[in-house]
Amino acid sequence: DRLADQAILDLARADVEFIDVGKKPGFPTPQEMINTLLVHLGSQGLNVVRLKGGDPYVFGRGGEEAQALIDAEVPFDVVPGISSAVGVPAAAGIPVTHRNVSVGFTVVTGHREKGGATSINWEALAQVGGTIVVLMGVSERAEIATRLMSGGLASDTPVAAIRYGTRPEQTTIRTTLGELADAPLESPSTIVIGQVAAFDFSPTAGTSAWARKAGHASLD
């Protein structure tokens, strides 16, 4: 996965073979190819790790890969992860829920389906309330903002976009829904929309304990 930090890959044994099947904007690795590769290698009795960022079953196509392995009768295991939908905002000091502010959150993908259509009813989502976390939505942020405002969300609704969340190079851009289209966002970024996006409960020392243990100097 393209979101796997190199520091994690460096922990592998020297004789491990790395196969890059990351999905980059404009240069995606076809999911069918990934499924076939997993089945092919797994059928040989090899120890295959499909390393992903976040949780494999939250917009990670993990279910499709699991189904392919089941159909081919290749045994597998799943190690749950912390979804970037909650882990990345937390690393930026943003709680996706907060008493008297947001009693729930919705996680959606901003990625379009084949053919250019989107299956998300953004206008209806604007009426749900709570926090909206958008994954893979950088390139579609203009339409997302327009449709959410058409659905009733105020243009001054706080928005935070966190790039490379939990990593040393993490950056956070704070803006509003009305200005989201012109914000200098880059992929990969997790977009948080709602009143909680105005919060900044970052560690008071500037670096969280787990980051210090990992040898990271700062998350700023």
Describe each model-derived feature in a short phrase.
Residues 8, 69, 88-89, 144, ...:
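Hydrophobic packing residues within well-ordered alpha-helices of enzyme cores
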Residues 1-82, 179-186, 219:
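Class I S-adenosyl-L-methionine
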Residues 3, 33, 44-49, 61, ...:
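A contiguous loop/helix-start segment that scaffolds small-molecule binding in enzyme catalytic cores
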